[in-house]
Amino acid sequence: MKLTLWTYEGPPHVGAMRVATGMTGLHYVLHAPQGDTYADLLFTMIERRGKRPPVSYTTFQARDLGSDTAEVFQQACRDAYERFQPQAIMVGASCTAELIQDDTGGLADALSLPVPVVHLELPSYQRKENFGADESFLQICRKLAKPTERTAQVSCNILGPTALGFRHRDDVTEITQLLNAMGIAVNVVAPMGSSPADIARLGAAHFNVLLYPETAESAARWAEKTLKQPYTKVVPIGVGATRDFIAEVAKLAGVEPKADESRLRQPWWSASVDSTYLTGKRVFLFGDATHVIAAARIARDEVGFEVVGMGCYNREYARPLRAAAKDYGLEALITDDYLEVEEAIQALAPELILGTQMERHIAKRLGIPCAVISAPVHVQDFPARYSPQMGFEGANVIFDTWIHPLTMGLEEHLLTMFREDFEFHDEAGPSHHGGKAVPASAPRAEATADEGSTPEEAVPPVAAEATSGEIVWLSDAEKELKKIPFFVRGKARRNTEKFAAEKGLTRISIETLYEAKAHYAR
């Protein structure tokens, strides 16, 4: 355990909350102290849900630890059933409550409530949020789903969408439309939008569509074994992946692999003349493994970017991500420490970052364009408009989202040609972003030589005064540095300063800049 300002995943009980909140007719009783009762904020503020999540807390306090916390939990279960009358109850403990080792499942069973009780045992100090969601959905399926007669029409279940998921609402709509167009009915969407009664009829479908492996792969594997339902392995993010998904679904359903591509614009937008400036742009990707693997394929094969780095924070999927990274000649970064991610980005100096909300913060600090491709996300990534990531419309949305942060081709040429112009300068940012442009810095006045000194003895102008041996840049070197493209300028500055420090120099001139360039080019 370590202290951090940011975490990509919460503890496992947050994953359980995401499953419970996405469902209807299910109530989650969480054994937790007062400090762990923050679910309302997560779902009502960030996701803008119009109702509170179906979660009740025991909210035990310090004084309860000297008495019977088991009774506190059982009373919370009774109250939750009497007040909400759910079809099923899910019980578990938060990371803090796990320390007192109350048997929440046994305590709930002892009440003999007239509804099914789903037990959760989530190892809070070994696993995290996505595992919690995956395990919770698995236990719900084990408890409620039974083999049953198949539907007359070929049908499938859509598995994986949860509350607080990245564009899950719109992805479900897009994929449902795609499946219906192929003549395949959707039996149940779960966990989001389903009730315990719906879970009970999961077995009626002929196969399962697994949209989000992080939150439903265990349930899909269980259904394959217990309910004899195969499941899809392709996640339909991007044009190529969506076409592969259609072919896979058609094979499972025994239908023709047909799809309406009339709304698909991404391939032409990517190939049009105005998009030639995208070719070869260096991009770094980080997020959950599913979205990163899909995004890397889009970036290289469909948009023409160069993938220079990729990684994920969920260690459960480190193996498939490492395998995918090898296809790009890369070593995957597997970490849940945002500082390591920031170091990797600084070292690679990409032109675009595709990541989570944290990478958006990193990009802002480093002055690099960024687009969000994966949870965790903040409130602005739960848009009011229809904005899927999956299917053909998702491919259109992805193209617009990724391209928007970049400076367009013509403007890049203007920046190169008129670098000191009042309108086209590096600090102004892309003109299509709106907001007030930062005025170009006024040219620094060059220092004059001391009286009586000859031109040869004149001291070159200094960009900043040195203090206590600090390395400073002379104005001519600073001006030369600005000729380097802005997306690699930071790396050039760091390398030059490192070179100067190794040589014992306190002032960097043009000569130092080019010596450093030659040194690191070897």
From Swiss-Prot:
Superkingdom of the organism of origin: Bacteria
Entry GO MF terms: 4 iron, 4 sulfur cluster binding; ATP binding; metal ion binding; oxidoreductase activity, acting on iron-sulfur proteins as donors; oxidoreductase activity, acting on the CH-CH group of donors, iron-sulfur protein as acceptor
Binding locations of substrate: 409-410
Keyword ATP-binding: yes
Cofactor requirement: [4Fe-4S] cluster
Binding residues annotated for [4Fe-4S] cluster, in chain numbering: 36
GO BP terms: light-independent bacteriochlorophyll biosynthetic process; photosynthesis, dark reaction
Compositional bias annotation for Low complexity: 455-464
Tagged with keyword Oxidoreductase: yes
Cofactor note: Binds 1 [4Fe-4S] cluster per heterodimer. The cluster is bound at the heterodimer interface by residues from both subunits.
Secretion signal span: none
Reaction(s) catalysed (UniProt annotation): chlorophyllide a + oxidized 2[4Fe-4S]-[ferredoxin] + 2 ADP + 2 phosphate = protochlorophyllide a + reduced 2[4Fe-4S]-[ferredoxin] + 2 ATP + 2 H2O
Function per UniProt: Component of the dark-operative protochlorophyllide reductase (DPOR) that uses Mg-ATP and reduced ferredoxin to reduce ring D of protochlorophyllide (Pchlide) to form chlorophyllide a (Chlide). This reaction is light-independent. The NB-protein (BchN-BchB) is the catalytic component of the complex.
PANTHER family named among the record's database cross-references: LIGHT-INDEPENDENT PROTOCHLOROPHYLLIDE REDUCTASE SUBUNIT B (PTHR33712:SF7)
Assembly with partners or alone: Protochlorophyllide reductase is composed of three subunits; BchL, BchN and BchB. Forms a heterotetramer of two BchB and two BchN subunits.
Name of the protein described by the UniProt record: Light-independent protochlorophyllide reductase subunit B
Source organism (scientific name): Cereibacter sphaeroides (strain ATCC 17025 / ATH 2.4.3)
Encoding gene (name): bchB
